[in-house]
């Protein structure tokens, strides 16, 4: 009988030790599921949620890159707008009949500097090596966890359009030339504004997309956490309980061994 009790007691001690080990592992890792043996189905589900979280986070980074692209383009377009506004101011001045040829020549010299700067900005505006204002380009932004979650971004060749509108042909050296330049400048400004509005709309859309992706990431992380994360209060209580059982078992085993020694 004593042998049976001793065996049962040893089993209790070993089981308590194993449960203490499991609790320690969960407390140290913060996870309820540390291997498939803990909960095979739960591990599969939590892994699926983790994969989605990573995908949402990367998609948000992709969308933020798109926002940076849109902001870069808008900054360049803003500078072009400022140059056109100054160019229009000079053109209005040159169109005034009170100026002489020398006055208009000075205004024309500054105007040529402005058109050169507009050309330079439209030629060099780029993001990560991709031309934004001097090429017709189609870009796909991957902004979701699945293959079809893309936003298409098109960039127009603004530089070419400005050339077609006569940017390099502006001549303020005569009153008639200045008057003719006004319509060309206004059409060019309208084209710049169209592109600014498109990049502004893209910026707003991507900002909303990032917000949605971040919320989706949070929701999936919470779902994963409910399945895979350890309940610290529960694990500590379980650890204390099993520690008491183990120590009680050891005490009983020690007493049993002492009685056996006395009998002998």
Where are these regions (language model features)?
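Primary detection of the long, small/polar-rich alpha-helical "axial" segments characteristic
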Residues: 1-264
């Amino acid at each position: 009988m004593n042998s049976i009790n001793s065996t049962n007691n040893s089993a209790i001690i070993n089981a308590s030790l194993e449960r203490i080990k499991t609790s320690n592992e969960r407390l140290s890792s913060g996870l309820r599921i540390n291997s498939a043996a803990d909960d095979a189905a739960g591990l599969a589900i939590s892994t699926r949620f983790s994969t989605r979280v990573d995908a949402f986070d990367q998609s948000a980074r992709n969308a933020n890159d798109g926002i940076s692209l849109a902001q870069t383009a808008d900054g360049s377009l803003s500078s072009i707008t400022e140059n056109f506004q100054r160019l229009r101011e000079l053109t209005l001045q040159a169109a005034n009949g009170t100026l002489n040829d020398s006055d208009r020549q000075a205004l024309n010299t500054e105007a040529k500097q402005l058109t050169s700067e507009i050309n330079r900005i439209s030629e060099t505006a780029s993001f990560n090596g991709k031309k934004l204002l001097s090429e017709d380009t189609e870009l796909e932004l991957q902004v979701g966890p699945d293959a079809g979650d893309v936003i298409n971004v098109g960039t127009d060749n603004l530089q070419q359009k400005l050339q077609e509108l006569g940017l390099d042909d502006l001549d303020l050296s005569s009153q008639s030339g200045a008057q003719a330049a006004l319509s060309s400048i206004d059409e060019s400004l309208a084209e710049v504004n169209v592109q600014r509005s498109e990049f502004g709309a893209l910026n707003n859309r991507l900002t909303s997309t990032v917000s949605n992706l971040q919320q989706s990431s949070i929701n999936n992380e919470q779902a994963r956490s409910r399945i895979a994360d350890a309940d610290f209060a529960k694990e500590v209580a379980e650890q204390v309980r099993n520690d008491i059982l183990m120590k009680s078992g050891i005490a009983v085993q020690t007493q049993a061994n002492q009685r056996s020694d006395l009998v002998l």
